[in-house]
Amino acid sequence: MDFITNSPEETEAVGAALGKILKPGTILAYRGDLGAGKTAFTRGLARGLGYCEPVTSPTYTIVNEYLGGRLPLFHFDMYRLASSDDLWDIGWEDYLERGGICAVEWSENVDDAMENAVYITIHKTGEECRRIEIEGGIDLADLSL
């Protein structure tokens, strides 16, 4: 399913709507160029899961954990990882077993570990306009914006 957004706030709104319907253990594999809006989408996702705290890119920490919402949110940035072999060094399997949502930026760097993932592809179509594709392994019938 595709969504067209015209501002970062609208991109966040799509993320928030998705956050309200996700089930425990969901892996979201983000794809998109630098500056496409992956972190903005995750800010909305966190809001949809019930978080009020600021959401920032985990570029330097590799993973940011948000606990205390409807489900735990683990926000990963795989930009600096060379391959999925590096995932095991950061405890990927432990995160999967915790029953939260794993939101993975730069998932293409670890694509072979994204089994059963929901793919979120964000295309930059203008300065603030985006086309967001959501595909695979999720029923979007209950998604309401």
Regions found by a protein language model. Give the residues of each.
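Hydrophobic anchor at the beta1->P-loop junction of P-loop NTPases
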Residues: 28-30
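Phosphate-binding P-loop
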Residues: 19-24
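Conserved lysine of the Walker
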Residues: 38
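Short phosphate-coordinating micro-motif centered on Lys-Gly-acidic
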Residues: 1, 47, 85-87, 93-145
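N-terminal pre-Walker A segment at the start of P-loop NTPase domains
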Residues: 1-17
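Short beta-strand-centered segment that lines the nucleotide-binding/catalytic pocket of NTP-utilizing
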Residues: 51-66
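The conserved Walker
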Residues: 34
